[in-house]
């Protein structure tokens, strides 16, 4: 039983590392590193912003983001 658990953890670790390597490979920006070689397309990871929804409503969207100085004190 312990061997099966260790095996499953090892398999999940290998799968996680493979996905990480694939994402790192495709997120490499060849234009900023070597502008003369553009043989492979690169993509930029999208940044998401919060939009008004039924749960948050538009009132929470107008609050400014806390600055780093008062990040932990904002409630």
Swiss-Prot record:
Record's GO cellular component terms: late endosome membrane; lysosomal membrane; lysosomal proton-transporting V-type ATPase complex
Record membrane topology: Single-pass membrane protein
GO biological process assignments: cellular response to amino acid stimulus; negative regulation of TORC1 signaling; regulation of skeletal muscle tissue regeneration
Tissue and organ distribution: Expressed in the skeletal muscle.
Lumenal side, ranges: 1-3
Disruption phenotype: No visible phenotype. Mice were born at expected Mendelian ratio with no gross abnormalities.
The name this protein goes by in its record: Small regulatory polypeptide of amino acid response
Localization (cell): Late endosome membrane; Lysosome membrane
Cytoplasmic topological intervals: 25-75
Primary localization: membrane
Gene that this sequence comes from: Spaar
Record's function text: Negative regulator of amino acid sensing and mTORC1, a signaling complex promoting cell growth in response to growth factors, energy levels and amino acids. Negatively regulates mTORC1 activation by inhibiting recruitment of mTORC1 to lysosomes upon stimulation with amino acids: acts by promoting the formation of a tightly bound supercomplex composed of the lysosomal V-ATPase, Ragulator and Rag GTPases, preventing recruitment of mTORC1. Acts as a regulator of muscle regeneration following injury by regulating mTORC1 activation.
Keywords: Endosome, Lysosome, Membrane, Transmembrane, Transmembrane helix
Assembly mode: Interacts with components of the lysosomal V-ATPase complex. Interacts with ATP6V0A1. Interacts with ATP6V0A2.
Expression triggers: Down-regulated in skeletal muscle upon acute injury.
Pfam family, one: SPAR
Keyword Ribonucleoprotein belongs to the record: no
């Amino acid at each position: 039983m312990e061997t099966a658990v260790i095996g499953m953890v090892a398999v999940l670790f290998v799968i996680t590392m493979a996905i990480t390597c694939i994402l790192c490979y495709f997120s490499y920006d060849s234009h900023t590193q070597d502008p003369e070689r553009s043989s492979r397309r690169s993509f930029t990871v999208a940044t998401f912003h919060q939009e008004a929804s039924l749960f948050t409503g538009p009132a929470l969207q107008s609050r400014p983001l806390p600055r780093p100085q008062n990040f932990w004190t904002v409630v």
